[in-house]
């Protein structure tokens, strides 16, 4: 049986088709799992992500939240404002930078984030469950290096540096900062 040689345009189209279909299918499950996880806390995905980013960065500018949360600046601002209205974070300006707006988690915001982390149930997470056979076969979960390389090219080194830092934080931060209840609860989950 002869195979047609794919020309660059066809190859690009086929590759793009695969990325679109696979990422859309994956995101549908990720989104459903994430919504179900945080629903009891009266949060949406953007709000939860803002709490997480603000915690991970020890406070952040709206621009940083937009960048690392992969959302428009107005989305980051509007959802941060809703969180401020609920008393979960505060807005401020820095003396050295009056142009940017910064957010910081309040103790209530830290507490709610901790509650969400403690409520995470891997057995209710579709992507996690679907990955278990790979973990059992290879002894570890997929590293996602191809996807990470693509995201690095799209969003830059600083995005991936924050991604690496927050990933490292989940596994190692409790050793350095055992007083951090959010990280401690992740290690126990």
Curated annotation (Swiss-Prot):
Keywords: DNA-binding, Repressor, Sporulation, Transcription, Transcription regulation. InterPro entries: HTH_MarR-typ, HTH_tscrpt_reg_Hpr, MarR/SlyA-like, Tscrpt_reg_MarR-type_CS, WH-like_DNA-bd_sf, WH_DNA-bd_sf. It holds the Pfam family MarR. GO terms for molecular function: DNA binding; DNA-binding transcription factor activity. Gene3D superfamilies: Winged helix-like DNA-binding domain superfamily/Winged helix DNA-binding domain. It comes from the Bacteria. Residues 62-85 bind DNA. Residues 12-156 form the HTH marR-type domain. Coiled coil: none annotated. GO terms for biological process: response to stress; sporulation resulting in formation of a cellular spore. Homodimer. Negative regulator of protease production and sporulation. NCBIfam families: PRK13777.1. This is HTH-type transcriptional regulator Hpr. It comes from Exiguobacterium sibiricum (strain DSM 17290 / CCUG 55495 / CIP 109462 / JCM 13490 / 255-15).
